[in-house]
């Protein structure tokens, strides 16, 4: 039995199949971890979601910002933006089944035996592992609760609050938790977010660093697997932190990692977008 983690799919199914063939993935015994952003911008968002659903008993998936955007658009079609490739999902006959499965996926997964966490974007440096799991569970509960679901999705958009406060309540509290787990790249040691900077790790504004680079980070004793940040090109010098988004949808590659051995595999992607992997302008 082997367990693999794969970077952002973003609706690119063929590179995923290439990788699973490369390692002779057997869903009867192997397991696949997904860092989120499984849909959007790529050419096969619907096919990708259906394929993952068929493997649902063999995978662990955390939600990314594009996945949450799909759920929000399923409630409010006006949320769709130019460049989204989500409409085919919303018009699919099996839409309800697929979206119900997606909304019940995790915001954060923690494997106690491996002492390894799986998130889409990261964990803010001021949070302990226990705090991060507790906050992730708050968003997961809102997604699973029919009375909170729509209000949460309608209220999750926006950059404020820029920093965590234990006294936050309601939608504002859930929004900053969501932004930490699904949109974060740079922040201060206290967790103040810069959500506008999207380039490489060495381009932080004064007072900011990549979330994983703060010396005071309280999850330094936990291994963390994440995606989201394509400009890192899968490179992270921080021990125990594994970046897996290598910009497939931008014409880069898709990367798969054996989480026990650290061995990586990649399959090249043909970008469906009009530009190749830039340092800027990623979601």
UniProtKB/Swiss-Prot annotation:
Enzyme nomenclature, EC number: 3.6.1.41
InterPro entries: ApaH, Calcineurin-like_PHP_ApaH, Metallo-depent_PP-like
HAMAP family, A to Z: ApaH (MF_00199)
Keyword annotations from UniProtKB, A to Z: Hydrolase
Membrane-spanning ranges: none
Enzyme's top EC category: hydrolase
SUPFAM superfamilies, alphabetized: Metallo-dependent phosphatases
Record-given protein name: Bis(5'-nucleosyl)-tetraphosphatase, symmetrical
Record's keyword annotation contains Plastid: no
Organism the protein comes from: Pseudomonas fluorescens (strain SBW25)
An example Gene Ontology molecular-function term: bis(5'-nucleosyl)-tetraphosphatase (symmetrical) activity
Family of this protein: Belongs to the Ap4A hydrolase family.
Cited Pfam families: Metallophos
General function of this protein: Hydrolyzes diadenosine 5',5'''-P1,P4-tetraphosphate to yield ADP.
Catalytic activity: P(1),P(4)-bis(5'-adenosyl) tetraphosphate + H2O = 2 ADP + 2 H(+)
Family annotation (CDD domains): MPP_ApaH
